[in-house]
Amino acid sequence: MAQVNHVENHLESDIHLSLIPSSWGSQVRELHMSDCHDAGLALAHSFATDPLSLYLLGVDGAASWSSEKLWKLHVRLMKYSYASYKLRGVATSIGPDYDAVALWMPPGTTNDDWIATLWSGIWRLWYLLPREGRKRFFDEVFPILHDTKAEIMGNRTDDCYYLGYIGTKASARGRGYATKLLDHMIYKADEDNRAIYLESSHVRNNKFYAKFGFEIKKEIVLTRGPRPIRLYCMVREPQNDKSSTSVADLGTDKE
């Protein structure tokens, strides 16, 4: 059935009218569990070419699945990850269509337990991932991330801010979204006098983080694929200088 817009002529003179809240394009907002589908899909797009994501799904030849099947699994992994972090942590976004998303675990919280694994759906990956991907995810990546964080942070491992994911869609990069998401939580971390810990999955992003005060403490090398995948463990100590940082948005990263 054709539908006529009777107010078309009245509105055509004002092309700026929109039902999308204008603040979404410039302000960081906290997400909810009900945002799981949209935020998870946004993260999937942000990390579609991420070295760690490709490694976990065996795109290097470990899995002979079709690209469509791998994409659907990638989306599920990101939705499960979102639920795992949002259960006890904080999820933030900026942009009119979840253009950039960050997942955080504040001090005193964790998603590294069986309750979060079961509730979020992460446990389903044991059955959904290809055989080699399952080994990489559960036997290699999970343990080494946990152990390395404990080694670096020591008795502060549960008393720091942990940036699990921060990703910007390819279509929204260069707008400073990642900077705003980081600044939003850095301000809180400095107020709390707490360090921030992350794992960078691409060397090109290390300079981006360095502008915020992050320093590389250790490299993790994943070796189950045909070429090694490197993760860079970085820490930012609390700083008293509250002057704002303005740097370019260099893309996405897994922390």
Go through the PLM ranges and name each one:
Residues 168, 174-187:
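Conserved acetyl-CoA-binding loop-helix of GNAT-fold acetyltransferases
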Residues 66-93, 100, 158, 162:
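A short helix-loop-beta-strand connector motif used in the catalytic cores of GNAT acetyltransferases and
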Residues 159-161, 188-201:
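Conserved GNAT acetyl-CoA-binding A-motif
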Residues 101-169, 173, 223-227, 245-247:
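Conserved acyl-donor/pantetheine-binding loop and adjacent beta-alpha core of acyl/acetyltransferases
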Residues 27-41, 49-52:
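A short beta-loop-alpha structural element at the N-terminal edge
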Residues 198-203, 222-255:
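C-terminal "cap" of GNAT-fold acetyltransferases
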Residues 179, 191-193, 202-219:
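Conserved active-site alpha-helix within GNAT-family acetyltransferase domains
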Residues 41-68:
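Helix-loop element at the rim of GNAT/NAT acetyltransferase active sites that forms part
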